[in-house]
């Protein structure tokens, strides 16, 4: 009788751990936030059209609200005036959350090495995957989504990852100085 029950158990139940189930659900249903700032946003929008179909990768609907999103795709040039807004939106997103930096401008400032442009979004939010190109093709964004899904698949549920970038005092003062200069030269 006990061997019969044992065989029934093995045939009808799947044993797994919680991390595998949670990570499968997280990577299969990413909810990206629309945060397009420049040219890369056009390619990000094109990725959701029928020709490219981002829904195949589990990132079907771009959300307009940070409280409904778990993936921020920063696509375009981040200016110093936009940086606090981006940080506030990042803070409003629920955990776990991820960030993809799409394009040269959001990754390293692009060709704009000026006082008004943030030289990399990773100075204010932690970036999980960088997408190269100016602007990158939708296929590059899909590759980044696959890399992010691989990263999510290896996460543990109980260990929290850092969701904040800590700036040392000199970087913080330099950042504030750049904001002051931008505000003086461009009063709003």
Swiss-Prot record:
GO terms classed as biological process: aerobic respiration; electron transport coupled proton transport
Subcellular location: Cell inner membrane
Residues that hold [4Fe-4S] cluster according to the record: 39-40, 105, 134
UniProt-listed SUPFAM superfamilies: HydA/Nqo6-like
Primary site of residence: membrane
Highest rank taxon of the organism: Bacteria
Enzyme Commission (EC) number: 7.1.1.-
Record keywords: 4Fe-4S, Cell inner membrane, Cell membrane, Iron, Iron-sulfur, Membrane, Metal-binding, NAD, Quinone, Translocase, Transport, Ubiquinone
GO MF annotation: an example: NADH:ubiquinone reductase (non-electrogenic) activity
InterPro entries, sorted: NADH_UbQ_OxRdtase-like_20kDa (IPR006137), NADH_UQ_OxRdtase_20Kd_su (IPR006138)
Pfam families cross-referenced by the UniProt entry: Oxidored_q6
Co-factor requirement: [4Fe-4S] cluster
Free-text remark on how the cofactor is bound: Binds 1 [4Fe-4S] cluster.
Catalysed reactions, semicolon-separated: a quinone + NADH + 5 H(+)(in) = a quinol + NAD(+) + 4 H(+)(out)
Membrane topology: Peripheral membrane protein
A GO CC term assigned to this protein in UniProt: respiratory chain complex I
Coiled coil: none
Assembly and oligomerization: NDH-1 is composed of 14 different subunits. Subunits NuoB, C, D, E, F, and G constitute the peripheral sector of the complex.
Function statement: NDH-1 shuttles electrons from NADH, via FMN and iron-sulfur (Fe-S) centers, to quinones in the respiratory chain. The immediate electron acceptor for the enzyme in this species is believed to be ubiquinone. Couples the redox reaction to proton translocation (for every two electrons transferred, four hydrogen ions are translocated across the cytoplasmic membrane), and thus conserves the redox energy in a proton gradient.
Family under the similarity heading: Belongs to the complex I 20 kDa subunit family.
Record-given protein name: NADH-quinone oxidoreductase subunit B 1
Species the sequence originates in: Solibacter usitatus (strain Ellin6076)
Gene behind this protein: nuoB1
């Amino acid at each position: 009788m006990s061997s019969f029950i044992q065989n029934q158990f093995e045939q009808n139940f799947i044993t797994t751990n919680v991390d595998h189930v949670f990570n499968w659900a997280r990577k299969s249903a990413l909810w990206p936030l629309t945060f397009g700032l420049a040219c890369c946003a056009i390619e990000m929008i094109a990725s959701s059209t029928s020709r490219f179909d981002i829904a195949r990768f589990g990132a079907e609907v771009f959300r307009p609200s940070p409280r409904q999103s778990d993936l921020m795709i920063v696509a375009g040039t981040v200016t110093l005036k936009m940086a606090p807004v981006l940080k506030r939106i990042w803070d409003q997103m629920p955990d776990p959350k991820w960030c993809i930096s799409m394009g040269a401008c959001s990754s390293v400032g692009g060709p704009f090495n000026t006082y008004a442009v943030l030289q990399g979004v990773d100075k204010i939010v932690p970036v999980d995957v960088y997408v190269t190109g100016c602007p990158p093709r939708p296929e590059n964004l899909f590759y980044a989504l696959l890399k992010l899904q691989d990263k999510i698949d290896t996460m543990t549920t109980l260990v929290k990852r850092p969701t904040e970038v800590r700036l040392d005092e000199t970087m913080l003062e330099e950042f504030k100085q750049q904001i002051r200069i931008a505000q003086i030269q461009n009063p709003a």
